Design a protein with these regions (language model features):
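PLP-dependent amino-acid enzyme catalytic core
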Residues: 1-141
Length: 142
């Protein structure tokens, strides 16, 4: 790639990408300045969660950061339990945006310090949540 003048930017395990994703944390705190007890963040490779958590914990350490993973792609949960990054043998693909076999090196370093809890959800729970969001706000935009 370099010989062609191209630069590879890792989709989640890059400090600049993580910092950029932290701006979502800034938006959350701006829009909900006093009403927040916890933020639930989907985790694949961990960049989004690491960015949001780093920003939020710096300004509002009392806010709980809850990482949410599909139970068939729970690479952060496995890494935290093992206290090291773990490569899953297989990952489910229903939640394809978070279907990652191994949490990033930099994201794991951050998340093991910043995340208050990791929860896993089943495909059925993901489907139910999609339906709930559609019923709550989706119909207004159809």
């Amino acid at each position: 790639m370099a010989e062609q003048g191209l630069t590879y930017i890792h989709p989640f395990d890059d400090p600049d990408v993580i910092a950029g994703q932290g701006t979502i944390g800034m938006e959350i705190l701006r829009q909900l300045p006093e009403q927040l007890d916890a933020i639930f963040i989907a985790v694949g490779g961990g960049g989004l969660c690491a960015g949001i958590a780093a920003y939020v914990k710096q300004l509002r350490p009392e806010i709980k950061i809850i990482a949410v993973e599909s139970d068939d792609a729970a690479c952060l949960d496995a890494a935290i339990k093992a206290d090291r990054r773990v490569r899953l043998k297989q990952v489910g693909i229903f939640a394809d945006g978070t279907a990652v076999a191994q949490i990033g090196k930099e994201t794991f370093r951050l998340l093991k310090e910043l995340v208050d809890e990791v929860i896993t959800v089943s495909t059925d729970e993901i489907c139910a949540a999609i339906k709930d969001v559609y019923n709550e706000i989706g119909r207004a935009h159809v």
